Amino acid sequence: MLHAVETAFYQKHVLVVGDLMLDRYLWGDVTRISPEAPVPVVHMQRESHRCGGAANVASNLAKLGLHTSIVGFVGEDSDGQVLISALQESGIDTHGILPLAGWSTITKTRVIGGHQQILRMDRETPLADTAHASQLLHQQVMPMLEGEQRPHVIILSDYAKGVLSFELCQALIVRARNLGIPVLVDPKGRDYARYRHATALSPNRGELRGVTGVEDGDLNTLLDAGESLRQSLDVAFLAVTLSEQGIALVDGSEHPRRIPAMAQEVYDVSGAGDTVIATLGAGLAAGLTRLDALHLANLAAGVVVGKLGTAAIDLNELRGALLTDATYEQSDKIANWAHAKQQIARWHAQGEKVVFTNGCFDLLHAGHVTYLEHARRLGQRLVLGLNTDASVSRLKGPERPLIQEQDRARVLAALAAVDLVVLFEQDTPLELIEQLRPDILAKGADYREDQVVGGDLVRRWGGRVALVQLVQGRSTTGIVQRISAQK
């Protein structure tokens, strides 16, 4: 997935608007308890600073390679300068940051002893005149939506510090909607009216409980309430973060789609929500579907919670997470008939169209890969029925297959276009098709529709047959013949 979007990241511009914060860390060791009070004594060793709040969202985007601009307030103080410098060092455009007189840069200072957070001290000053502040930001941000340099995605990072007023949010969302720019919101508080007509909201479980009033009940009840909220706000989808249970996509489908958590170890959840909204925005800007973008965001969150303190993810870490994920997914993609039937039922429940194709796929070549990619585009999922070795021998002769069935299945499962590989030992896939009940039956364009095995069955339950163009001059038989001729 990342290979397909990495180049797009570098070509996309994301604008972040919200509450800027500086995270300060005081690192040391704890070896004793104070004689003055029952508190640990921390022997200070070093101090570090990181971007927090909306600044951390921007930091994640920049580390993923996107052109990133940020708009918000800092105070006319040294912490504000430290934060601006940190953003600029990450390559983030800070021209939209306004120093605000009489206001302190929001700073969170954490004392860390022996890799354990001992204390957090917050310094923040309430905005004295929120209407004036909103007007200043309005004047700053609205011109950034116009012209050739306008963003591909806007992210509103709301920490309820008074920066994202109702008036500012609605002005941004309405103008962006008219321009076709998606607006993603990491929300706060119990009044979500300010986010009406946004593209997506990413509340966590607690935030969704707070705004919907569903304090008790199971997760399904909460997600049902989330769907009602989505409809009332005219929002395209909710990405509900569920800690150890992953992320749920609430978008009007019959059942919310769940993406399981991928974290191996959890050290610190600070900033995980920032990483989710940033990676989701990056994925959508790069052209991913909302489900694929959320899958990417879920992997990214699994990386950052394994770090101590507020942290951002970079491309190398995301590559590693995707490789690990692909390793696990590959074995899961090879299924028996019963498992395949269950998985397809789940996809159907999520409103996804399932494409089925079949073949021997002996000596996988570029023609096969192109065919499978085209077949996958006919729906949302591609199931590949693979002839067993015995079946191939009956069809192709005793010298075939050249590659054993488990090896063929393993290679095919590694392809991004293939969602499931199912072996069948019959001469035709008719029985398998009857069991799996796909929506679309794909076959090479060297067949006629009336020649496609299972076509009548699929049409009977409302599906269709699709003929896919083949790459000329590419076939396993041709390769085998050329090899034999050279002996």
Swiss-Prot record:
Q: What is its EC number?
A: 2.7.1.167, 2.7.7.70
User: What are the record keywords, sorted?
Assistant: ATP-binding, Carbohydrate metabolism, Kinase, Multifunctional enzyme, Nucleotide-binding, Nucleotidyltransferase, Transferase
The residues the record assigns to binding ATP are 204-207
User: Which pathway, per its entry?
Assistant: Nucleotide-sugar biosynthesis; ADP-L-glycero-beta-D-manno-heptose biosynthesis; ADP-L-glycero-beta-D-manno-heptose from D-glycero-beta-D-manno-heptose 7-phosphate: step 1/4; Nucleotide-sugar biosynthesis; ADP-L-glycero-beta-D-manno-heptose biosynthesis; ADP-L-glycero-beta-D-manno-heptose from D-glycero-beta-D-manno-heptose 7-phosphate: step 3/4
Q: Where is this region: Cytidylyltransferase?
A: 356-487
Which GO cellular component term is one of those annotated? cytosol
The molecular function terms in GO held by this entry are: ATP binding; heptose 7-phosphate kinase activity; heptose-1-phosphate adenylyltransferase activity; phosphotransferase activity, alcohol group as acceptor
Going by the entry's taxonomy, the superkingdom of the source organism is recorded as: Bacteria
Q: Note the InterPro entries from the entry.
A: Bifunc_HldE, Carboh/pur_kinase_PfkB_CS, Cyt_trans-like, PfkB_dom, RfaE_dom_I, RfaE_dom_II, Ribokinase-like, Rossmann-like_a/b/a_fold
- Asked if the keyword Acyltransferase belongs to this entry, the reply reads no
Q: Where is the active site?
A: 274
* SUPFAM superfamilies the UniProt entry points to: Nucleotidylyl transferase, Ribokinase-like
Which GO biological-process labels does this protein carry? Answer: ADP-L-glycero-beta-D-manno-heptose biosynthetic process
Q: How does it assemble?
A: Homodimer.
Family per record: In the N-terminal section; belongs to the carbohydrate kinase PfkB family.
Free-text function comment from the UniProt entry: Catalyzes the ADP transfer from ATP to D-glycero-beta-D-manno-heptose 1-phosphate, yielding ADP-D-glycero-beta-D-manno-heptose.
- Please state what the protein is called: Bifunctional protein HldE
